[in-house]
């Protein structure tokens, strides 16, 4: 609820302010081309296709290909990143303090600006969240889920995919070294499941 409230307030405050022709305009143009049935990279110059399909999906659902519909789609992605970020912060906090959580949420949102950075920062937070999820309890499902997040991250940016792979491999090595008796899943099987998740996430 806090995430949705703050993202809505920030959107009402800044949602109709400013326009970056190169960054935001490039994304807007790409999303419109996707709505016309074109494919990013193949049919028009673009970054990785994930962000265009995300924006185009919501623009289609809204029945609007305007700039405000694009910004709403980006704000929704921002909300996901802020929610996961707050979850990680709260998980690491010894005491749940509403003022601390509120301050953390505001800092997270300010850190994400300008608007075209929402994707990149949110994806980084999601990758960190998936690794926390894996470290907390390295089960088969969590290995696969961690790989799935890396694969999806690569759809939004090859650099994010690369960072996710490096972070995941480092985490799996650490889990292998610090393996506890309760962790019955072998390293090889965990790597296989993670790899399957990466392929599945990147497949679209």
What spans do the regions from the language model cover?
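Hydrophobic alpha-helical membrane-interfacial segments at the cytosolic entry of transmembrane helices
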Residues: 1-7, 183-204
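Extracytoplasmic catalytic/substrate-binding loops of multi-pass membrane glycan-assembly enzymes
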Residues: 15-30, 41-57, 64-68
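Short, aromatic-rich membrane-interface segments at the entry and exit
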Residues: 19-20, 97-100, 116-124, 141-142, ...
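Hydrophobic core segments of transmembrane alpha-helices in multi-pass, intramembrane catalytic enzymes
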Residues: 27, 78-82, 120-132, 145, ...
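Aromatic- and kink-enriched transmembrane "portal" helix at the membrane-lumen/periplasm boundary
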Residues: 67, 71, 102-125, 151, ...
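Transmembrane-helix motifs of polytopic, lipid-linked glycan transferases
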Residues: 72-95, 133
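Membrane-interface alpha helices of multi-pass inner-membrane proteins
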Residues: 108-109, 143-158, 164-169, 198-201
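Membrane-interface transmembrane helices that cradle and orient dolichyl/undecaprenyl
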Residues: 127-145, 153, 177-182
């Amino acid at each position: 609820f806090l995430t949705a409230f703050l993202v809505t307030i920030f959107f009402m405050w800044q949602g109709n302010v400013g326009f970056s022709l190169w960054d935001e305009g490039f994304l807007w143009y790409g999303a419109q081309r996707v709505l016309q049935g074109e494919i990013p990279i193949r049919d028009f110059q673009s970054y990785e296709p994930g962000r265009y399909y995300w924006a185009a999906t919501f623009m289609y659902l809204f029945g609007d290909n305007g700039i405000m519909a694009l910004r709403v789609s980006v704000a929704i992605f921002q909300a996901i990143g802020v929610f996961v970020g707050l979850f990680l912060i709260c998980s690491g906090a010894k005491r749940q303090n509403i003022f601390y959580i509120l301050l953390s949420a505001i800092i997270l949102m300010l850190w994400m600006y300008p608007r075209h950075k929402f994707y990149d920062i949110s994806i980084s937070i999601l990758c960190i969240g998936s690794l926390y999820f894996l470290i907390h309890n390295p089960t088969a499902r969590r290995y696969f889920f961690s790989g799935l997040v890396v694969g999806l991250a690569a759809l939004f940016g090859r650099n994010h995919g690369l960072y996710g792979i490096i972070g995941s491999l480092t985490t799996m090595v650490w889990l292998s070294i610090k393996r506890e008796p309760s962790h019955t899943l072998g390293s090889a099987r965990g790597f296989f499941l993670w790899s399957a998740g990466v392929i599945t996430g990147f497949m679209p």
